[in-house]
């Protein structure tokens, strides 16, 4: 491995990211494919990945931390994960887990995807304690064999990689499984010096106001009326291709757009629908129409900064649409979607450079909130992979995945994950709400007209 400091990026230094990001792929296995051959192919792919991108076979450490300074996260060499050792872990749960066919036939409900069994690490935002005897790998891949299939969970340490980075890791494993060489461009981008990927503002350049990202002192945080986490629950819902088309058409009425908005994407329309219907059931419960409701979207800023998709570092910028609960519940879908699109349109190179400069200048980054002030009983945050063509990817002897999921981990209230679009054009959405709000959502006629319950 070259100088470990090269693996330090700017946006990945928030302590809250000391956790693991997960993407799970499911594959059917025919009887004529031996598990031994699958393990051999996966292990060869994992070794090739860690050889081509050495920091992936390293451990994540924090250096330079102390009073008033949260230090820097980087990957350093670790024999435990570096070739000839492997970042692949293998588990067989054939005897005591549902079959692959049962999971897929049920459309992949969260109840059949136990992260404590089918994943090697806990998930963001749950952190971990690392030590010499139990170091934190930059990436672990767990292959869980069950009757009729295999589940591949990619668990990437979040200070070093965002969702786009994990997707690129998956792409390179698929490339190797197809018997192809990892492209030179992918190797160069994966190993580039991260410290200067985002050009920070010069001292003389004005910085935007990012004070909303500073955490208020504990004494200033009002008591949260939300019930115990034991009452929070993850649930999957499906939006069919025809439903997505209908929502896009409804949300594309320019008469209701904010004047600055000229276009609404399908993802805008879907996120606006999620925002509006969840806000509506919460308004019925809370009876607080004037409370501001925020939807925060995690945005991949590689394109904004002209950084190739092969780059694996943290490149996420959060933007929010805001409307009072009462207005949001009664607004047209086009109005809600245009509010979200207007927020996306505010992202440009200067805004990102200003944000990165603000983060870089804070020695104690524990004082920063990931996306600003957030009331989980009102606000919500969404991360979307809808445009990622994982269902069409070729994994050599495994074929294409029949299921893409985030496994079931500790609940994170008001968090939404949008899964990649299937070959048929459907999109599945994972939502964490209180049981009461999930029940109210499933009883909402407007919701059930468009969303199919998976569980």
UniProtKB/Swiss-Prot annotation:
GO terms for molecular function: acyltransferase activity, transferring groups other than amino-acyl groups; pigment binding. Keywords: Acyltransferase, Pigment, Transferase. Disruption phenotype: Leads to the accumulation of pyran intermediates devoid of the medium-chain fatty acyl moiety such as monascusone A. Its EC number is 2.3.1.-. O-acetyltransferase; part of the gene cluster that mediates the biosynthesis of azaphilone pigments (MonAzPs), a complex mixture of compounds with a common azaphilone skeleton very widely used as food colorants. The first step of the pathway is performed by the nrPKS pigA that forms the hexaketide precursor from successive condensations of five malonyl-CoA units, with a simple acetyl-CoA starter unit. Gene3D superfamilies: Chloramphenicol acetyltransferase-like domain (3.30.559.10). This is O-acyltransferase pigD. Induction: Expression is positively regulated by the azaphilone pigments (MonAzPs) gene cluster-specific transcription regulator pigB. Belongs to the trichothecene 3-O-acetyltransferase family. Pfam families: TRI-like_N. It comes from Monascus ruber (Mold). It is an enzyme of class 2 (transferase).
């Amino acid at each position: 491995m070259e100088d470990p400091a090269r693996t330090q990026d700017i946006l990945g230094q928030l302590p809250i990211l000391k956790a693991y990001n997960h993407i799970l792929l499911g594959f059917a296995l025919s009887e004529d494919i031996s598990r031994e051959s699958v393990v051999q192919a996966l292990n060869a792919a994992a070794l090739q990945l860690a050889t081509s991108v050495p920091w992936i076979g390293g451990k994540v450490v924090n250096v330079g931390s102390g009073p008033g300074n949260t230090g820097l996260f980087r990957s350093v060499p670790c024999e435990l994960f570096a070739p000839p050792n492997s970042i692949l872990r293998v588990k067989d749960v054939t005897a005591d887990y549902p079959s692959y066919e049962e999971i897929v036939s049920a459309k992949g409900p969260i109840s059949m995807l136990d992260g404590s069994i089918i994943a090697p690490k806990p998930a963001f935002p749950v952190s971990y304690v690392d030590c010499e005897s139990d170091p934190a790998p930059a990436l672990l891949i767990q292959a869980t064999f069950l009757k009729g299939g295999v589940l591949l969970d990619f668990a990437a340490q979040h200070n070093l990689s965002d969702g786009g980075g994990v997707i690129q890791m998956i792409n390179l494993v698929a490339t190797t499984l197809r018997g192809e060489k990892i492209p030179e461009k992918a190797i160069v981008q994966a190993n580039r010096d991260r410290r200067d990927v985002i050009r920070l503002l010069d001292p003389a350049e004005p910085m935007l106001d990012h004070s909303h990202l500073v955490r208020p002192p504990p004494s200033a945080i009002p008591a949260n009326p939300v019930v115990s986490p034991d009452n929070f629950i993850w649930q999957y819902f499906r939006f069919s291709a025809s439903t997505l088309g209908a929502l896009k058409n409804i949300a594309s009425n320019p008469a209701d757009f904010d004047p600055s908005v000229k276009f609404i994407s399908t993802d805008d329309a879907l996120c606006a629908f999620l925002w509006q219907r969840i806000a509506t059931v919460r308004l019925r419960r809370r009876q607080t129409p004037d409370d501001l409701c925020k939807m925060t979207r995690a945005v991949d800023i590689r394109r904004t900064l002209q950084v190739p998709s092969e780059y694996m570092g943290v490149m996420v910028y959060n933007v929010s649409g805001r409307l009072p609960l009462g207005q949001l519940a009664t607004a047209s879908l086009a109005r809600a979607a245009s509010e979200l699109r207007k927020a996306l349109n505010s992202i440009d190179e200067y805004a990102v450079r200003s944000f990165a400069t603000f983060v870089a200048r804070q020695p104690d980054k524990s004082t920063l909130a990931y996306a600003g002030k957030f009331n989980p009983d009102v606000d919500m945050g969404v991360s979307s992979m809808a445009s990622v063509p994982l269902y069409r990817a070729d994994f050599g002897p495994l074929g294409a995945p029949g299921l893409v999921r985030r496994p079931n981990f500790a609940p994170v209230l008001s968090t939404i994950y949008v899964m990649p679009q299937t070959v048929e054009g459907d999109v599945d959405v994972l939502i964490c709400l209180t049981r009461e709000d999930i029940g109210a959502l499933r009883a909402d006629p407007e919701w059930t007209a468009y969303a199919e319950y998976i569980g």
